[in-house]
Design a protein with these regions (language model features):
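Terminal amphipathic alpha-helical/low-complexity segments used for targeting or macromolecular assembly
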Residues: 1-47
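Flexible, glycine/small-residue-enriched loop-and-beta-strand segment within the central core
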Residues: 54-64, 69-117
Length: 117
């Protein structure tokens, strides 16, 4: 799936507004799941529990299985894809990062996408 930089930036901007709402307002668990479903672009299972705050840079390349618990202050940098399979617990303050920048300064603006984490 090849996306133009402009399209990626539009999705990031939309998701930043959703994340700001998610992390600064009071929400019940079902509202948290609904907002995160909007951020990732697909419905997540009712068995997924995510403690706030939660952060992602892009959101659309995150996939959640079932029976997942994500503790507070977790960051997912997901342009390269992140798959959280069934029965996973993620501790507080964890970072899942699936993208990097080129080391060569001449190519540094390019992104280096890896297989899903």
């Amino acid at each position: 799936m090849k996306m133009e930089s402009n399209e990626i930036h539009q999705i990031i901007e939309q998701n930043q507004r959703l994340l700001q709402n998610l992390n600064t307002q009071r929400h019940c668990e079902c509202e948290v799941r609904q907002l995160i479903s909007e951020i990732i672009g697909e419905k997540i299972s009712d068995s997924v529990e995510i403690r706030l705050p939660f952060f992602t840079d892009y959101g659309r390349n995150i996939k959640f299985g079932k029976d997942i618990f994500i503790n507070s202050n977790v960051t997912m940098v997901d342009l390269g894809g992140i798959v959280i399979e069934d029965h996973v617990f993620i501790g507080p303050g964890a970072y899942l990062i699936s993208v990097n920048h080129m080391i060569d300064p001449k190519r540094r603006k390019e992104l280096s996408l890896k297989k899903s984490v």
